[in-house]
């Protein structure tokens, strides 16, 4: 059967549009180049002092982040947009305090290291803008440097986050205010935007409340819920109908994660 040329003329431009639209979106997160900064530590031997934090993850043990975590300075934290991002870090250029062989550690951004403007940036105000600084959980700091060092020079780079299981969506709030905590994000690890769809609604954008807590004022009670997450590398993961219509506030639902 012959193909109508008019159909080809209609389809071909659409194909080109879709091709160019998707061309710049990577299949997997590729990370970034090596950069320099400094690192200190906090939270105690068991990292109990790192719980909670400005990303809103709460108990980092039960959420799966463990002790391989970091608080980021203002320039790196980016008003919470870097929450969930993963970094490879190694102690460098300080043979007195760096461990032999300059081993790498991999950490997830879970907190904010606030500036101390009463102190100079090179003597106590380590997290003052515009410095790039990592305040590591103590156990992970000790994997790259000696305790007595206090502060060490490092090299760091963004890397893909490797997580076990799917993206987790914890729904808090009440009937007229939904606060969704999103955790365990693989790939880029961070979240650029997210949206929710009820079984009786279209897709609705959520707004960042703080850290990785995202809010909606829509009434979603009694509807099954789907979620869509887009990370900073523009990849999108859609989790269809993961919350049943009888979901309750405080429950966590697991969706589809990004490929790594």
UniProtKB/Swiss-Prot annotation:
It is found in: Secreted, Cell wall; Membrane. Residues 1-23 form the signal peptide. It is a peripheral membrane protein. One of its GO terms (biological process) is syncytium formation. CDD domains: DPBB_EXPA_N (cd22274). It holds the Pfam family Expansin_C. GO terms for cellular component: extracellular region; membrane. Its main location: secreted. Keywords: Cell wall, Cell wall biogenesis/degradation, Membrane, Secreted, Signal. Residues 176-255 form the Expansin-like CBD domain. Residues 52-166 form the Expansin-like EG45 domain. Causes loosening and extension of plant cell walls by disrupting non-covalent bonding between cellulose microfibrils and matrix glucans. No enzymatic activity has been found. Belongs to the expansin family. Expansin A subfamily. This is Expansin-A16. It comes from Arabidopsis thaliana. The lineage of its organism: Eukaryota, Viridiplantae, Streptophyta, Embryophyta, Tracheophyta.
